[in-house]
Swiss-Prot record:
Keyword Transcription: yes
UniProt name for this protein: Putative AraC-like transcription regulator
DNA-binding residues: 219-240, 267-290
Keyword DNA-binding among UniProt keywords: yes
Amino acid sequence: MDPLEDVLTLLKTRSHLSASLVAGGRWAVRFDAPRVVKFNAVRRGTCQLEVDGIDEPIDLAEGDCYLLTRPRSFTLRSDPETAPVDGGVVFARAEDGIARAGQGDDVFLIGGGFSFGTRAQELLLDRLPPIVHVPADTPHAETVQWALTAIDQELTHRPMASTLIAEHLAVIMLVHVLRLHLERAPHAVSGWLAGLADPVVATALTCLHRDPARSWTVADLADTAAVSRSTLAARFKATVGQGPLEYLTRWRIELAARQLREGNATLASIAHSVGYGSESALSVAFKRVLGMPPGDYRKHPTMP
């Protein structure tokens, strides 16, 4: 797997679709801070997005979509002057999967959210800006538009297994949105995500993710990237925020933590599978990274 696929798989990414929103005239709907990573896509018309803590509203055009990666209240509206109504009330009145605001049907949005397993905040969400906005005219955004159109069709026509298919399509959309964001704004992300935008660092990251149990050295990684050891070490540290071997240690611990959360494998077998020669070596590294011994983590996996 490549690093992005690896992390999204580790986090057990799932999507949840909500009712669509049809609006017209002058309207505004305010939403409480979502407990998931919220997404919306404008399928028809235009509107504004205001997010708590963000100074300027974002103009959304037909075909635009966005992710909210932080739990912040937000408002969708036609104009700045209209007083917002509570989104919970609006969506409680939804019929046939469609909520309505204002008068008319000038605007049509589909939306939902993404949920992740343990460790999502540190591994992924903190690496992204609070808002990831993908305008419809973004280069190479055709696949995002294809996924959104397919979701729209599934929700409109409701063939068999439409919800399941639409939710899987939403995950496909998420991956493409993240790809496009890395292409458009590589400096707006941090950590390993930022590393994917640097071809030298990305090569090293891919090697570490493909074979995390290998006894990698900086020289090995430099050879795969066709640069000197000093160049690789400097670029990796500057981009990712830590050295390649420190990153490897942390990724190994994430893999070990997943096995502790999800299975009954012995600590010895887990240690071997992620590149440690003994239980004690894994235990020392695990406590240094996550702040508790592996045995305690297995009992209380949500504590760090």
